[in-house]
A protein has these predicted regions:
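A short alpha-helical cap/connector motif
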Residues: 1-104
């Protein structure tokens, strides 16, 4: 659909790239087949964070913590994120990634 393609083009034009830590985490997640948000949604999320300046976010599905750390990086300084994960094997991985990023 034309409108959908225009929207994707616009969202992709917003891509500023990520911090080196997020780039590394994204590469590890993809190599280990852990689902994380696609690049176009990363750009869209950064735009929403800039426009809305949320104070609180509830994230359902932490996985390795990539989206949480993306929101921490690009959200306002006083942003509080609560993230939940039901797959027990991923919880320690996410906690370690939060520690490594200095976002415990």
């Amino acid at each position: 659909m034309i409108v959908e393609e225009r929207m994707k083009t616009y969202i992709n034009s917003l891509d500023m790239g990520n911090t080196p830590f997020l780039q590394e985490l994204e590469a590890q997640a993809l190599a280990n087949r852990v689902p994380i948000i696609r690049r176009d949604m990363q750009s869209f999320m950064r735009m929403l964070l800039a426009v809305k300046q949320p104070k609180r976010i509830l994230e359902v599905g932490t996985a390795v913590g990539f989206s949480t750390l993306l929101m921490c990086e690009y959200g306002p300084d006083d942003l509080k994120i609560t993230t939940i994960e039901n797959y027990a094997k991923r919880i320690p991985v996410a906690k370690e990634n939060f520690r490594r990023a200095g976002r415990e």
